[in-house]
Regions:
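N-terminal module-boundary/linker segments of secreted carbohydrate-active enzymes
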Residues: 20-44
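Bacterial N-terminal signal peptides
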Residues: 6-15
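Domain-level detector of nuclease and nuclease-like folds
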Residues: 32-34, 46-213
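Positively charged n-region of N-terminal signal peptides that target proteins for export
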Residues: 1-4
Length: 213
């Protein structure tokens, strides 16, 4: 009994020390909303992993990679927090927009802990941010893989979201594929200019873009 009590005290003081060090949860300047085109991720690595996200029955297009707290320069991650981690039920409820409960868990652990929110509130805000940005329907109409410049993707999002300006969005590519669209949002989820470290515009003129499965 004495050793159990001692172990509990060690854990409590260790947790208190962790909260006293590192990046402070809830202290950041704005959010980055990251959207990933699921068919491209599946072609690059998801199929090789046997990810259920890539099964055609899900009909995934733009999924929510994450909602990331951001500084004007740099970003926090894995922040010490007293907030309880999400339950399995919570992460499963995010599968419809995040593709997998595993991604939802990872995003909470790396980014949600820095939001200052509870897991439930972080997921609710993430869903709200996802719904706030219109995803151009034109990409769901593709019936075969195409090659296109990232600028085409960016322009489609700008046209679909009148409140967005070019300095509020960036499109990334990876291994020859369009990878992600990232939109910078205020704490109230209004579009704001991105910091220079967020802007990573893909300069390739012919990145692959796969159709919905």
């Amino acid at each position: 009994m004495r050793w159990a009590l001692l172990g509990l005290l060690v854990w409590i003081f260790g947790a208190m020390a962790a909260l006293a060090n590192g990046e402070k949860s809830g202290e950041f300047d704005y959010y980055v909303l990251s959207l990933s085109w699921s068919p491209n991720w599946c072609a690059r690595e998801g199929d090789a992993r046997g990810s259920d996200q890539c099964d055609a029955r899900h009909d995934h297009g733009w999924i929510l990679h994450g909602l990331w707290p951001q500084y004007h320069q740099g970003w926090p991650s894995y922040c010490p927090t007293a907030k309880a981690p999400p339950s399995r039920a919570m992460t499963r409820q995010m599968e419809d927009i995040q593709g997998s409960s595993g991604l939802a868990w990872h995003q909470w652990k790396k980014h949600g802990t820095c939001s200052g929110l509870s897991a439930a509130d972080y997921y609710a805000l993430s869903r709200q941010a996802y719904d706030r940005i219109a995803r151009p329907p034109v990409f769901r109409k593709l019936d075969k893989a195409v090659k296109l410049p990232a600028r085409v993707v960016e322009d489609a999002f700008l046209d679909a979201n009148p409140g967005l300006e070019p300095d509020m969005i960036t499109v990334t590519c990876k291994h020859g594929y369009i990878e992600e669209v990232r939109v910078c949002l205020s704490r109230d989820l209004d579009p704001v200019p991105c910091g220079r470290d967020v802007i990573r515009d893909c300069t390739a003129s012919d990145s692959l873009f796969d159709p919905i499965r």
